[in-house]
Each structure stands twice: as C-alpha cells, then as structure tokens.
Amino acid sequence: MDGTVTPSPTTTAMPPVSALDAGTPTLPPEAPLAMPEQNLREGSLQVRHQRTSPPGIGVRRFYLIGGTFATTAIAVWVMLSVLWPDGISVLEGCLLGLFVLLFAWIAMSFASAVAGFVTVVARAGRKLGIDPEQPLPTLRSRTALLMPTYNEDPRRLLAGLQAIYESVAETGQLEHFDFFVLSDTTREHIGRAEELVYNELCDRVDGHGRIFYRRRADNAARKAGNVADWVRRFGGSYPQMLILDADSVMTGDTIVRLVAGMENNPDVGLIQTLPAVVNGQTLFARMQQFGGRVYGPIIAFGVAWWHGAESNYWGHNAIIRTQAFADHAGLPSLRGRKPFGGHVLSHDFVEAALMRRGGWAMHMVPYLQGSYEEGPPTLTDLLIRDRRWCQGNLQHAKVVSAKGLHWISRMHMLIGIGHYFTAPMWGLLMLIGIGIPLAGGGIDLAGDLPFSPARYWHGSSQGNAIWIFICTMFVLLAPKLLGYIALLLNPRELRACGGAFRAAVSILLETVLAALMAPVVMYLQSRGVFEVLAGKDSGWDAQVRDDGKLSWPALFRSYGGLTVFGLFMGAVAYAVSPALAAWMGPVIVGMALSIPVVALTSLRRTGMALRRAGIFCIPEELDPPKVLVRASELRRAAALEPSLI
C-alpha cells in the first residue's frame, strides 16, 4: 500500500483548467521576499541567550543531563555486578556498550517525562503572554495560513480548510488573514479537481480575494520547496505565516492567540503547538490518539520545559515569522547522492536550527489547545510514513555539524537520528543476551535441566539481573503511569476519557497491543535503517487519511516473510528448550501474529466497538470543539458527492 490516491471507477467529468473564471484571481499581487540558501560550512550563533528564555534554563538542562547520567550510572553499576565476577568477555562487552546507550536513551526520556508531569500537574509552563483563559486579543498585522497539498483528495482537504476559515471568521478578525492552498500535485486529474473544488469553496464562503490557490509546475524540494516558493513570491505581504498539514484543523481562537504571541514578542521566530490526534476510527488509530492524548502532554510539556527558547519545529500547526524564515531557513541541497544527498527531507528540524542560529527564539506552547491533526489509520500506513522519516532523520548526519548551530539544535537532530538506531540496537541487545549463556554454558539437550537464559542470568547475578529488568521496564513505562496519574488529578479530562477504570483498561490494552506490534516495528525500522545506509531512497507518496482498508493479499505481502521468520525462530527455540522459547516469547509471538494483529487493529468496527464500550475515549469525542464538528460535517457531505478523482 503506497498511500496514493487512485482514480475511482465512478468519476465525474472534469472541465479543462481553462474553464476556471479568468476574471477571478487565484493569487494576490506578488510581494517578493529574498530567501537565500544557507551555508552549512560557515556561520555563527547570533544570540546565545534569548530574552524569552525561561528563568533557570541552565538548571533545567543540568537536571536533564545530570539525571540521565546519574540514573544510567546506577543501572550500569548493577549491570557490572552481573558481568564482572568472571571477567567480561567480548560478547559481554558488546552487551554492556549497548546497555549503556539504550538505558541512557530511556533514562533521558524518563527525566524529561518527570519534568513534564510536574509542569502539567502544577499548571505551569505558560509563556509569551499567551493565555487561553484571557479575552481574545485584537490583532494588528496580516497572517497567511498555508495548506500545502500533494495528490490529496481535494474535497476532503478543502473541507478542513473551510472549517478553519469559518472558525477564524467567528473571532471577528478575518480581515487579518489570507488562506493559501499550495498544491504540489503531480496527477493532472487531481489538479483539475483541486481547481474546481477551490472555486466551489470560494463561492460558498464568499472567499474570493481571501482564499488563494497555487499549483507548482515543478515540485522541487517537496514540501520545503513548496513553502519556500510561496515565501519568495508572496512572503513580503505577511509578517507571519501559519503552516498547516493536509489533515490539520485549528480553532480561530488558537490561531488569533498565536498571531498575538508573535506580535507581542518581536524576537520570537516560531511558536509550535501540540496537535492533538483526533478522528481515529480504526482500532490502531484510536489507540494512537488515546496514547497521544494521555501520555503526549507529559512528553510535550517535558521537552518544552528544557527546550526553552530552542524548541523544535514539527513542520505543521506552527506559526512562523516570515522575514526570519526567509533570512535564515533557505535550505541548501546536500552534497552527494540520495538518500543522504540532495534536498533536505526532514526539513523542519533543519529550518528551526538555522532560524535559531540566526538569532530567533523558537518556542513550544503545549498548553494551548485547539490544534488538531489525524493519525495514520493502520500500522502499515504508519510504517510507510516512518520509512520516509527514517531517511530524513538519518540525513541530518550531514547537517548536525553545521557551523554556528545552538547545541540544543544539534541535540534535536541527534535524538532524531538515535530514534531509528535504537531499533537495531534493541534487537542486538536481545540476541547477545541469548548468545552469552549459549557461549557460556552451551546447549545440553540430554541434560537434567533444559537450557534457559533466565536461569543463567538469575543464577550468575544473585538476582541483580531481575532488578535490571524491573528498573528498565519501569523507566520505559513511566510516561504512561505519569500520564494516568495526571489524568486522575484532572476530573474533567478523566471523565472525558471514560473514568478511572476505563482509562486504566485503555492504558493496559494500549500497552499490550503496542508490545505485540513492537517486534514488527523494530524489524521494519531496522530494515529501514539498513536500506538507507545501503542507498535506497524512500520516494514521496501521498498519505492515507481515511480508514485503512488492507486486503489479505496486501497483508501477506507486507508481513508474510516476517511471520514465517517468527514461526521459524519459535520452532528452533523450542527445539533447543521450551524455556528459551518462553524467554523469546514476546518477540516470537509479535512476529508470528503480525498479520492477524495488523488486520485486527486496522478494522473500523473493532475501534468503534471499543469506543461504544468507553475504551480509548478522548475529550474531543465527549465534547468536540465546534471546528472539529464542522470539519466532520463537511467531510461527510463531501463523501456523498460524486467522486472527482
């Protein structure tokens, strides 16, 4: 499944492009803005300490790094007590090295999550004068809302834009905003459909002269090039631009407050919101959006707490100062061939780093609600997107050493790179954990006691190996636990998530399903890393937005090999020892059952049945904001229209 939109057998005849009313302008007068390509080999950090940086930011970062180091040091000391008595072999040295890196990885996430939990419970972390509980500010400047699109269903796309447009109009400040649909569509029939639906939208909301449409003839540099083209042609008319994704929905209230935050803080270059994932209907989408709603704030508030004025950019649902972006975020083409060379794929991290190098503050405001997106409907769709992100993040290895970057910006990129390398590292850790007892004790099929890695590790460490396992699992699962505690302390949110019992059941079920899918994700992420290192490009396809519809042949093509491999591993492990098969059970079961698990979680009826039972519920379903209700109404109505594609 490549996620692209395919022609329908019942399509409506489309008029030629020239049939658009020539008297109705689709673009405003151009206001060019220079956007030079940045030099990664030259440059210096313009401002080291930002005015809007929170007090004690150095202490916060010391806590994060010091806490990570201290927690990891304790775990390594215990691990050494397991390995040291008989000396450390080559395999044990490899195990120790992997353990240090992986435990430090999860320890940093744990330390950040603890900070996020305290911030959420204390209702702290508000900054830039953006307070959603205060009256709506009056704006003074113009802002462009940009919605890039690439081979998307135009009716669905513009239904979301219409909901945003109407929500902004309800604030009484529509005159401060223009809306742009920036098309990079390559399929001609979809391009013609975009123009027709755009015209219908403008007629419907009287948006001519305020809603604009532009389709590039050459979609060079993908989304980054799409936005850069707009900046170079029209950016001079708009002090701010708010970047949307094709599935983004934002309330007018939130948009106005973001613009006011930029107007009142002239040294801020970017403000990133925390988009809540909504509208999930398949089991997979619903478990993802529940996890994002319950654990997501803990994680987001944590990183915002120590990011300070060096926050990251996620590519959408964020407002950017146009002049700052033009001056500092022109992306160069990286030297070499794909996948590491060429256009920057994960452009958002790099744009944020370059803007911070240029002296602009970058902030995240996770407390500001009213920002929404949709998640992939199936694990397959997630992994297709993840493969593209893998290539983009690994490509940052060519950018992380650029001159003049703030060290936190470099850290963002290293974390992004590390996210994908942890998958093969976890796999190696498990294999070495089995290999050490095999090398140490061998396999005696005729012995009184069958081979058991668990017995080996327990017997050789006086129980310390068990403590390492318990501590590792606690650190891994702590964000879920902290998210649940924070939910219990917020009666309104708790009620909207189904109450304490149903929320606990949801967390437990999400954890079990995530554990079943973890071996699949680990394998495919590891394969993605090796493919990128081998030079295989990910390409660029449109994303699937609606319910996933995975056929059994497609499932067997995607996961058949992994299923056979899991069954083979299970048979070999059982032949050696049932205890070994039990030790490897979580990985074997996840691989062997990958087809039915992906099929089950891809079903809409399963997800909706759990919703009726109060499982995986989120506040936006109990009391949906008006903009989401309107977007859903418009999309349902659009689905009833004759297909244009």
Curated annotation (Swiss-Prot):
Residue ranges, annotated region (Disordered): 1-32
Keyword set includes DNA damage: no
InterPro entries tied to this protein: Glucans_biosynth_gluTrFase_H, Glyco_trans_2-like, Glycosyltr_2/OpgH_subfam, Nucleotide-diphossugar_trans
GO biological process per UniProt: glucan biosynthetic process
Membrane topology: Multi-pass membrane protein
Polar residues bias: start-end ranges: 1-13
Transmembrane regions listed in the UniProt entry: 64-84, 98-118, 423-443, 465-485, 504-524, 559-579, 580-600
SUPFAM superfamilies: Nucleotide-diphospho-sugar transferases
Gene Ontology MF term list: hexosyltransferase activity
Cellular component terms per the entry's GO annotation: plasma membrane
One Pfam assignment: Glyco_trans_2_3
Highest taxon of the lineage: Bacteria
Free-text function comment from the UniProt entry: Involved in the biosynthesis of osmoregulated periplasmic glucans (OPGs).
PANTHER family xref list: CELLULOSE SYNTHASE CATALYTIC SUBUNIT A [UDP-FORMING], GLUCANS BIOSYNTHESIS GLUCOSYLTRANSFERASE H
NCBIfam families reported in the protein's UniProt record: PRK05454.1-4 (NF003957), PRK05454.2-1 (NF003958), PRK05454.2-5 (NF003962)
The protein's name: Glucans biosynthesis glucosyltransferase H
